[in-house]
Amino acid sequence: MNKEIISKIVKASGVSEGELVLVHFWGEDADKDIANHFVTSVAALGAAPVLLQQARSINRDIFLSAKESCFDDRYFDLFSKFDAVLDVFAYQPVVLGYSIENEHMLLYRRYMSQLFHKLAECRRFTQIRVPTEANAAESNLEPQDYIQRMNKAYNIDYEMVKKACEHETKRFAGAKKVTVYTGTDCVLSLDLTGRTW
């Protein structure tokens, strides 16, 4: 994923001047350049970026020594200040990837639960799966094939997609149900009752 694609994604996420944006990065230091590109892209749009890295190796060490008092309401209240979150993962998020004692794992799980509860309160929350070999392992594709496909999928005209979506939203205004036919006996029906667009 190059800088140009990252800039397009950040802009398409709605980042605007004067906002406070959390770049929540799931990855090790080896992939930190990716996080740095997201941070600089946020700043280039006139918003204030803040980086929080969730590296498995660092989290293991933190939660092996952390106490209950480390992550109280004051800590989590910091996250309610953000206008937007860019949740960027170079590998599967939340999974610690290490065995730690049950009491430490319980603290880690509570931390993650409370963190995501606060982040969900932000006005915008965008998740971005970075084309990496680690993410490819979950796709059942060869790493280079996965990376190539994902880079191509991200390298689109987001403004054109937005306009097309707005057009379709108007077209389906007032619709109660949409049915999609994708082949013989392949039908997907969506109930739109009460849906706010």
Where are these regions (language model features)?
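Active-site bordering "gate/hinge" segments
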Residues: 1-197
